[in-house]
């Protein structure tokens, strides 16, 4: 029995970076483990939304109270970053980013993905994969370009020569560094957190990993908040037309 427990602990603490389980779709290879965990997170969010909105009451119950609190938090976050006049249409986008990243990060800390065996690689939080974080960052880039072009038309590109045309290369470079910083910050923090916990579980499996897991949950929440806040700030900058 003790041997079985030790085997399970070492399985949970095994560290594999760069190992992937692929699905072949036509001539393309996709990272199956990222899709599996992403679908799980999306399904969980949809399930919670359906349960919370199935029977709305004038005097809300505990679940409805919690959902309303989350929505108010997202609304206030979006309004603070984008502004009173424009924020309403961007609540769904910023809210979806925040909730997906938050639940993805927490799933990596709370769910023992490594127990589920794959032919190759291992399951982990969706945000533990650089492809996911880059995709989220690119979506944010598309969103703030769309926001600026939709409001200002082609005159939006005039921001690149403000306050002087000399800054044109730097202003263009800034639009490339924004998604890079968003994606690598999120990916690096989540990967580092899971690696630290995995190493500590393998060294001291019973005591030290517990406070580290709580710290990881806190850090995961902060990273989701930072990503959503910066996404809202970038959209707000595009709508205002200045940096």
UniProtKB/Swiss-Prot annotation:
GO molecular function terms attached to this record: proton-transporting ATP synthase activity, rotational mechanism
Localization per record: Plastid, Chloroplast thylakoid membrane
Record-linked SUPFAM superfamilies: F1F0 ATP synthase subunit A
GO cellular component: chloroplast thylakoid membrane; plasma membrane; proton-transporting ATP synthase complex
Keyword Transmembrane helix: yes
Keywords of this entry: ATP synthesis, CF(0), Chloroplast, Hydrogen ion transport, Ion transport, Membrane, Plastid, Thylakoid, Transmembrane, Transmembrane helix, Transport
Pfam families in alphabetical order: ATP-synt_A
TM annotation in the entry: 32-52, 91-111, 130-150, 195-215, 216-236
Membrane topology reported for the UniProt record: Multi-pass membrane protein
Subunit (UniProt): F-type ATPases have 2 components, CF(1) - the catalytic core - and CF(0) - the membrane proton channel. CF(1) has five subunits: alpha(3), beta(3), gamma(1), delta(1), epsilon(1). CF(0) has four main subunits: a, b, b' and c.
HAMAP family assigned to the protein according to its UniProt record, in alphabetical order: ATP_synth_a_bact
Function summary: Key component of the proton channel; it plays a direct role in the translocation of protons across the membrane.
PANTHER family assigned to the protein according to its UniProt record, in alphabetical order: ATP SYNTHASE SUBUNIT A, CHLOROPLASTIC (PTHR42823:SF3)
Protein name: ATP synthase subunit a, chloroplastic
Gene: atpI
């Amino acid at each position: 029995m003790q041997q079985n427990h030790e085997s399970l602990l070492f399985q949970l603490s095994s560290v594999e970076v760069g190992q992937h389980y692929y699905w072949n779709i036509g001539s393309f290879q996709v990272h199956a483990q990222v899709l599996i965990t992403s679908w799980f997170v999306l399904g969980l969010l949809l399930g919670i939304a359906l349960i919370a909105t199935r029977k709305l009451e004038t005097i809300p119950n505990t679940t409805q109270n919690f959902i309303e609190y989350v929505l108010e938090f997202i609304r206030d976050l979006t309004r603070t970053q984008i502004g009173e006049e424009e924020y309403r249409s961007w609540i769904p986008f910023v809210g979806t980013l925040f909730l997906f990243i938050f639940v993805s990060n927490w799933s990596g800390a709370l769910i023992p993905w490594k127990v589920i065996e794959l032919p190759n690689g291992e399951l982990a939080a969706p945000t533990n994969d650089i492809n996911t974080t880059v995709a989220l960052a690119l979506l944010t880039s598309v969103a703030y370009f769309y926001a600026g072009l939709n409001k200002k038309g082609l005159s939006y590109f005039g921001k690149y020569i403000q306050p002087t045309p000399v800054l044109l290369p730097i202003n263009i470079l800034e639009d490339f560094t924004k998604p890079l910083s968003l994606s690598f910050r999120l990916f690096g923090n989540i990967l580092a957190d899971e690696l630290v916990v995995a190493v500590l579980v393998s060294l001291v499996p019973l005591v030290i990993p517990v406070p580290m897991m709580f710290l990881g949950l806190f850090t995961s929440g902060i990273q989701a908040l930072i990503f959503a806040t910066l996404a809202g700030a970038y959209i707000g900058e595009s709508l205002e037309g200045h940096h």
